[in-house]
C-alpha cells in the first residue's frame, strides 16, 4: 500500500465535506482539492458570459478557454480563472442555486474529469465532491460518503454565510438544499450516490473533530 493515499469524500450539499477535507489534509500534510469550487468557477463564468446553463457543448467550449488553478492557502485553497481570483464570488447564492444545472451536463463533466484526475494522480490528496468515489477516483484508497439531515446542513450553511457577511435565510436554505439534493440525485450523468465500497458517515450530531477522528481511524485501517 502506498503511503500517500487518495481519499475521496462524497455527499450532498452542506454535509461538511469541505470543512472536513481541509482539516484532514492539513493534519495529514496532503493537498486538498475542492471539486465543487471547479464547477462553481465554471458556473460563475457562464453566468457572466450569458451562456445557457444547460447548453453542454457551449459550456465545454467555454471551459477550453478557461485557465483554472487551485492554489493551496491557509483557508484551504484559492481559486483562479486565469489571473482573476474567484474564491469568494463563486460562493454567491446565484452560483449556488445554478451550479447543479451546469454539473449535470455530460460535456462539462467530461471536460473537467481529466483535470480532477490529474490533480490527484500522485496521491497525497483529499478530494471532495458529489461523484469522486463513483466516477472521478473510482480506485481511491479510501472513500467516505458523508451526510447529515437537511435541517442541520441548512444550519451549517447559514452560520457559514453569516460569518462571511453573506445574506442568509435559514428557511430558504432548507428549501434550496432539499431541491439541490433532488437535482443531484436524479441527474442522468454521475448522480449523487454512495459508492459500493464507501464508508457511510452521518455527521448530523458529530463535531468537526469527531468526524475527523472517525475518518482518521478509517485511514489507519487502510494503511494497516
From Swiss-Prot:
Name under which the protein is recorded: Cytidylate kinase
Protein residues bound to ATP: 11-19
Keyword terms, alphabetized: ATP-binding, Cytoplasm, Kinase, Nucleotide-binding, Transferase
GO CC field: cytosol
Matches recorded under InterPro entries: Cytidylate_kin, Cytidylate_kinase_dom, P-loop_NTPase
Statement: the UniProt record of this protein carries the keyword ATP-binding: yes
Catalytic activity: CMP + ATP = CDP + ADP; dCMP + ATP = dCDP + ADP
Pfam families listed in its UniProt record: Cytidylate_kin
SUPFAM superfamilies recorded: P-loop containing nucleoside triphosphate hydrolases (SSF52540)
Native species: Exiguobacterium sp. (strain ATCC BAA-1283 / AT1b)
GO MF, any single term: CMP kinase activity
Family: Belongs to the cytidylate kinase family. Type 1 subfamily.
Example GO BP: nucleobase-containing small molecule interconversion
Alphabetical list of CDD domains matching this protein: CMPK (cd02020)
EC number(s) reported in the record: 2.7.4.25
Subcellular location: Cytoplasm
Amino acid at each position: 500500500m502506498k503511503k500517500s493515499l487518495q481519499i475521496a469524500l462524497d455527499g450532498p450539499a452542506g454535509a461538511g465535506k469541505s470543512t472536513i477535507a481541509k482539516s484532514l489534509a492539513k493534519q495529514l500534510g496532503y493537498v486538498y482539492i475542492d471539486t465543487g469550487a471547479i464547477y462553481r468557477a465554471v458556473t460563475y463564468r457562464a453566468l457572466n458570459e450569458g451562456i445557457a446553463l444547460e447548453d453542454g457543448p457551449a459550456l465545454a467550449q467555454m471551459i477550453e478557454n478557461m485557465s483554472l488553478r487551485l492554489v493551496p492557502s491557509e483557508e484551504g485553497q484559492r481559486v483562479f480563472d486565469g489571473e482573476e481570483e474567484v474564491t469568494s464570488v463563486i460562493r454567491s447564492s446565484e452560483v449556488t442555486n445554478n451550479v447543479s444545472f451546469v454539473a449535470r451536463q455530460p460535456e462539462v463533466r467530461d471536460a473537467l474529469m481529466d483535470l480532477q484526475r490529474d490533480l490527484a494522480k500522485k496521491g497525497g490528496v483529499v478530494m471532495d465532491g458529489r461523484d469522486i468515489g463513483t466516477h472521478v477516483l473510482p480506485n481511491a484508497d479510501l472513500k467516505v460518503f458523508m451526510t447529515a439531515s437537511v435541517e442541520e446542513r441548512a444550519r451549517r450553511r447559514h452560520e457559514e454565510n453569516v460569518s462571511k457577511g453573506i445574506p442568509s435565510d435559514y428557511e430558504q436554505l432548507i428549501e434550496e438544499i432539499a431541491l439541490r439534493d433532488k437535482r443531484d440525485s436524479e441527474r442522468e450523468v454521475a448522480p449523487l450516490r454512495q459508492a459500493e465500497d464507501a464508508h457511510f458517515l452521518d455527521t448530523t450530531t458529530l463535531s468537526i473533530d469527531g468526524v475527523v477522528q472517525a475518518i482518521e481511524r478509517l485511514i489507519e485501517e487502510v494503511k494497516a
